[in-house]
Amino acid sequence: MSEPQRLFFAIDLPAEIREQIIHWRATHFPPEAGRPVAADNLHLTLAFLGEVSAEKEKALSLLAGRIRQPGFTLTLDDAGQWLRSRVVWLGMRQPPRGLIQLANMLRSQAARSGCFQSNRPFHPHITLLRDASEAVTIPPPGFNWSYAVTEFTLYASSFARGRTRYTPLKRWALTQ
């Protein structure tokens, strides 16, 4: 029997937007601001599942495959910091309804399948920096990245040789 894996559902960023965000982050945040999230690990988490058995992963994948949700456009136009969790994030002022619906469906399915789900409201974001123990200056509004979201992904998270790696396991297309 295989070992449980640490899993989550997420939305990827297109490579060109990921590169622009990395450049923007390097321009606006000094190295001491926090530990930058690796470019390949930038994503928007929809539902964190925790440690999941192969059997539960299969069941969650079947449920995810039944979702019929239209695609939507994400506009990343907001940033902030959560001091308690020591995170600097990039997000959106007005999350699209489709994003909220997709996250709610996945979180609800996860909870019904026995995966703990936080009772805190969903705050869609992309983590830019971790271990940001001091308050940082957030760049003024004016940045804006938009892209069409056409799929979501199930990821496995692993830690080896001092690095976190997110491996895509399966993708599902959103309807047109």
Curated annotation (Swiss-Prot):
Its EC number is 3.1.4.58. The keyword Ribonucleoprotein does not apply. A motif (HXTX 1) lies at residues 43-46. It comes from the Bacteria. It is an enzyme of class 3 (hydrolase). Disruption phenotype: Disruption abolishes ligase activity in cell lysates, but mutants grow normally under laboratory conditions. The keyword Lyase does not apply. Keywords: Hydrolase. Pfam families: 2_5_RNA_ligase2. Changing H125A: Lack of CPDase activity. The active site is at H43, H125. It catalyses: a 3'-end 2',3'-cyclophospho-ribonucleotide-RNA + H2O = a 3'-end 2'-phospho-ribonucleotide-RNA + H(+). A motif (HXTX 2) lies at residues 125-128. InterPro entries: Cyclic_Pdiesterase, RNA_CPDase. One of its GO terms (molecular function) is RNA 2',3'-cyclic 3'-phosphodiesterase activity. Hydrolyzes RNA 2',3'-cyclic phosphodiester to an RNA 2'-phosphomonoester. In vitro, can also ligate 5' and 3' half-tRNA molecules with 2',3'-cyclic phosphate and 5'-hydroxyl termini, respectively, to the product containing the 2'-5' phosphodiester linkage. This reaction does not require ATP and is reversible. Monomer. Belongs to the 2H phosphoesterase superfamily. ThpR family. This is RNA 2',3'-cyclic phosphodiesterase.
